[in-house]
Amino acid sequence: LAISFFACWAVLLGRSALAMALVALAVVIDNVDGWMARRTVGRNLALKHFGAHFDCYADYISKGIFPVLYLLTATDLQVVSIPLALTYLMAIAVRYSYEFVPDRDHIGLSPDYMIAFLCLLQLAAPQLGSAFIPTLMASLAGFAALAVASFPSPKLKGWALVGFCLFLLVLAAVLLAGDQGMNWLTAGL
């Protein structure tokens, strides 16, 4: 939750690369935390229930609110981006409501993939030039639709989850290395 908050703060300060690195790290921590929680023996039902709901709130910040803040700052708060921002927020809220429907498979595409895509998009931003904003807007619209689509989506497990988390960590490292405000990392080299 704290890392997601700092990612939102960084994007509002105009530090998009740092913000993306932080939100990628938040997704990795979310996946590791979930893995650990499922393996914790002897957790009482109340704590399990609380943890699932609290996790969902934290996810909504990193995978719902953060992408919208990224869009709004990238478009300099242009009014044209507001309907898309609201649509995306509603789609992600609906997607997370599926988490609490008993005996139901995971429906729609996980918002984790949106974060990975946004990291890649941030890295490609200089090459995209004026196509960056339309690409970002189309991506958010597409991911919003996929998040609430009626197809079942498998949950990443085992080595697939490890690979995805490692991919996000590499993206975070590349984003940090390219962040203009992070020159102190290489100052002594």
Regions found by a protein language model. Name each.
Residues 2-53, 88-89, 139:
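Membrane-embedded alpha-helical segments that form the functional core of polytopic membrane enzymes
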Residues 3, 33-36, 58, 62, ...:
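Hydrophobic side chains within alpha-helical segments
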Residues 5-11, 63-73, 116-124:
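Membrane-interfacial alpha-helical segments at the cytosolic side of multi-pass membrane proteins
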Residues 10-13, 72-76, 101, 128, ...:
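Juxtamembrane transmembrane-helix termini
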Residues 20-29, 75-88, 130-142:
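Structural signature of hydrophobic alpha-helical transmembrane segments
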Residues 35-44, 90-105, 145-155:
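C-terminal ends of transmembrane helices
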